[in-house]
Regions:
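Short beta-strand edge/turn micro-motifs at domain boundaries
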Residues: 90-135
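Short, low-complexity N-terminal intrinsically disordered segments enriched in polar/charged residues
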Residues: 12-30, 118-121, 128, 147-162
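A short, surface-exposed beta-strand/turn
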Residues: 89-103, 239-252
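Sec-dependent N-terminal signal peptides
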Residues: 3-12
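Short, solvent-exposed recognition patches
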Residues: 193-267, 272-275
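N-terminal domain-onset segments
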Residues: 142-220
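Short, aromatic-enriched amphipathic alpha-helices that serve as compact interaction elements
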Residues: 17-36, 167-175
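Surface-exposed, charged secondary-structure patches
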Residues: 50-94
């Protein structure tokens, strides 16, 4: 009987061994190939990864670190950091669970961040006279703010988290000012744009936003009416920022076409990115 069981395990068509999302992610981003890859893919990724894993398409010298961000009964998210001596980049692997087990369904990252470094290089290369001219033309977003904001927008998750912790007293001060102003006291409705405009125009709020290189405060960036989102920046609907929601039960769910990652920073704060 023991030998018959071993034989069955080797027969063609045998069910793949069940793997957890983190295990699948580690295999999928490893620099070597992964023969049973297709058994663990579904949805859009099944059509994208036809012959190579993501790891085979990434330059071999890059270090790859996988971290489980969330795992429920039906969905899971694993963050992948790619790193070398000069840079870091983050991807997010979204999983679904079906009757056969966990499958990798979608891969997401913050869009258009490649635009940031050339813009920073251009701005930091301006001579003093042109910087002064820039500041006159952009009184609400100075040269120093724009450079700092662009750098923060294109930073790796680990660097944004470190930035938040280093400046947490100012983030808490900004939060208290927004809450004290009661700009978002009413439920979201037709007056939401006016409430948001009033919050961002408040002198104390505006000063702290600019000091922290933040673009704006809003409730609309993450479609969470009970959350405050302090947006760093982004393009179209692909944004990054810091979200505040002290009640975990009210956090929005992560999804490939919504919030692609939500990473806890402590005391009700989260780093978020949208698709």
């Amino acid at each position: 009987m023991k030998y018959l069981l071993l034989l069955l395990l080797w027969l063609p068509g045998a069910a793949p061994a069940p793997l957890a999302p983190l295990q699948i992610a580690e295999q999928f981003v490893a620099p070597t190939g992964w023969a049973p890859m297709k058994d663990y893919l579904c949805c859009e990724v099944a059509g994208q990864a036809k012959t190579q894993t993501l790891g085979q398409q990434i330059p071999a010298p890059l270090r790859r670190t996988c971290e489980l961000v969330q795992q429920g009964t039906a969905t899971a998210v694993v963050a992948v950091e790619l790193r070398d001596s000069a840079s870091r980049r983050d991807f997010y692997l979204h999983f679904q669970r079906d009757t056969a087990g966990w499958k990798l369904a979608a891969i997401r990252t913050l869009a258009m961040t490649h635009l940031g470094p050339p813009m920073v290089a251009l701005l930091t290369g301006l001579p003093p006279a042109e910087i002064a001219s820039y500041n006159r033309k952009h009184p609400d977003a100075s040269h120093a703010f724009t450079v700092g904001n662009l750098r923060l927008w294109t930073s790796a998750d680990a660097d944004i988290a470190a930035y938040f912790h280093h400046h947490q007293p100012d983030f808490q001060k900004l939060l208290r000012r927004v809450q004290a102003g009661k700009f978002f006291a009413a439920a979201p409705g037709p007056n939401e744009p006016a409430a948001e405009a009033a919050a961002n125009a408040d002198p104390a709020v505006h000063t702290l936003l600019r000091r922290l290189f933040l673009g704006r405060v809003t409730r609309r960036a993450t479609n969470c009416s009970s959350c405050l989102a302090f947006v760093i920046g982004g393009k179209t609907t692909s944004t990054v920022g810091l979200l505040y929601q002290p009640r975990p039960a009210q956090l929005p769910a992560m999804a490939p076409d919504g919030i692609i990652v939500l990473r806890p920073l402590g005391q009700g704060w989260y780093l978020y990115k949208t698709a």
